[in-house]
A protein has these predicted regions:
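Glycine/serine-rich phosphate-binding loop and adjoining beta1-alpha1 elements at the start
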Residues: 34-168
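N-terminal cap/recognition module
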Residues: 1-31
Length: 169
């Protein structure tokens, strides 16, 4: 769904993935953004392909090249099941001319000036791949976790905490 000029949701890949699963996930993203913001629509990219197949990279390159006009203007994506944001989504979308996989959300929802877009997307590009070096913000600085790793990990850990608050354990 397109809302507030944009929509967001990750890109997943698995053998047997079908349209109904992708639509359901997109609806879930719509609810997520309605509750937590920003006020945008929900989306999801789904690729019915075995992620263990050695042709995976080529499939992702063709997919992101095909959707790059959307990613430049109103769709934002990231990693999801079997698709890594740092090692696959960011570099492959960049090869397709997309500054960052969230460029479309920023462009469509905020309608920035070109200068503001360059500045903000530049900050985003540097921020999510930044390796956390401060022991106060990383469980293990030797493992070289990125900001993106910690954001994902925080969401997972909060979900687990919530489950235990509801059901004990």
């Amino acid at each position: 769904s397109l809302r507030g000029g944009a929509a967001g949701g990750g890109t997943r890949m698995r053998k047997g993935l079908d349209k109904n699963e992708v639509l359901s996930l997109a609806k879930t993203m719509e609810v997520k953004f309605t509750v937590s913001g920003p006020a945008i629509g929900g989306a999801k990219s789904g690729i019915n392909f075995d992620p263990k197949d050695p042709r995976k990279e080529g499939v992702l390159k063709r997919w992101f090249a095909a959707v790059s006009p959307l990613l430049k203007n109103y769709y934002g994506t990231g990693g999801d099941l079997n698709v890594d944001e740092i090692h696959e989504v960011i570099p492959i979308t960049e090869e397709s001319g997309v500054w960052h996989p969230q460029e479309g959300v920023f462009t469509g929802h905020f309608t920035p000036t070109e200068a503001d877009k360059i500045n903000r997307i530049g900050q985003l590009r540097q921020g999510v791949v930044k390796i956390i070096e401060n022991v106060n913000f990383s469980p293990d600085v030797v493992r070289k976790y990125t900001v993106a790793d910690m954001i994902t990990g925080y969401g997972v850990s909060e979900s687990i905490n919530h489950y235990y608050r509801l059901y004990g354990g």
